[in-house]
Regions:
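ATP-binding/phosphotransfer module of carbohydrate and carboxylate kinases, centering on a glycine-rich
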Residues: 1-18, 26-30, 50-59, 71-90, ...
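Conserved NAD(P)H cofactor-binding loop of Rossmann-fold oxidoreductase domains
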Residues: 23
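A charged helix-plus-loop insertion that forms the helical arch/lid used to bind
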Residues: 31-44
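Internal amphipathic helical hairpin motif
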Residues: 45-49
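Short loop/edge segments at beta-strand edges and connector loops
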Residues: 61-65
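Gly/Ser/Thr-enriched, mixed-charge loops and adjacent short helices
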Residues: 67-69
Length: 206
């Protein structure tokens, strides 16, 4: 993976700071979990591995949902919204990001929050809807349970929902019955790229 990243960077002739996203928990550039990638990444400093491949170029590695949340809060659906903004990405699992007045609370992993005896993503990921053949109405009830569990813990000011299914937000967001406003992501597939660039140039957690 590091060699592929280096090849892309070199192709564009980029020598400035680089932001890289990863589908799991990352602390100080070190990979802590590996749900959808090889377990050998756990405990490895992805930041150092990639930087070494790039001859010492500055590299920042962060969770992919965190990157998307940063971008949506600053430039997308959460633009000009103060307080606590929570991004949830619905796909194979559920990714999450929490932004408070522009600052990231990293690695929240709400997809693994227990809701009614099940992990949130086992209850309400869009893959569950597809696998079980649920209607949007039935699936929205499960999403509502996840949102309410998060609301009970932290009282957010806005939920932003992303992932491929957010493109059909008009079919299910109006069916949600939680108290906090819910809006679809605006930047879609570019959110992670924009957020990675933000993290590469600024300390987004302080």
């Amino acid at each position: 993976m590091a060699k592929t990243i280096a090849a892309i960077v070199n192709e564009f002739g980029w020598s400035g700071p680089l932001g890289v996203t990863y589908p799991g928990v990352v602390t100080e550039g070190v990979v802590q979990t590996a749900a959808n990638v090889d377990k050998s990444w756990i405990g490895i400093s992805a930041r150092d591995v990639i930087s070494t491949e790039l001859n010492g170029q500055q590299v920042t590695v962060l969770n992919d949902a965190d990157a998307a949340g940063l971008a949506e809060e600053r430039y997308g659906a959460g633009k000009d919204k103060s307080g606590v903004v929570v991004l949830l990405t619905f796909g194979t699992g559920i990714g999450s990001a929490v932004i408070h007045n522009g600052k990231l609370l990293p690695n929240t992993e709400f997809g693994h929050l227990e809701v009614g005896g099940k992990e949130a993503e086992h209850r309400a990921a869009s893959s569950v809807k597809e696998r079980r053949g649920w209607s949007y109405k039935k699936w929205a009830r499960q999403v509502t349970k996840v949102l309410v569990a998060i609301e009970n813990a932290m009282w957010p000011d806005l939920f932003i929902v992303g992932g491929g299914i957010s493109r059909k937000a008009d079919k299910w967001v109006p069916l949600l019955t939680n108290r906090t406003p819910v809006v679809p992501a605006a930047l879609q597939n570019t959110a992670g790229i924009v957020g990675a660039a933000m993290a590469a140039t600024t300390d987004v957690t302080h």
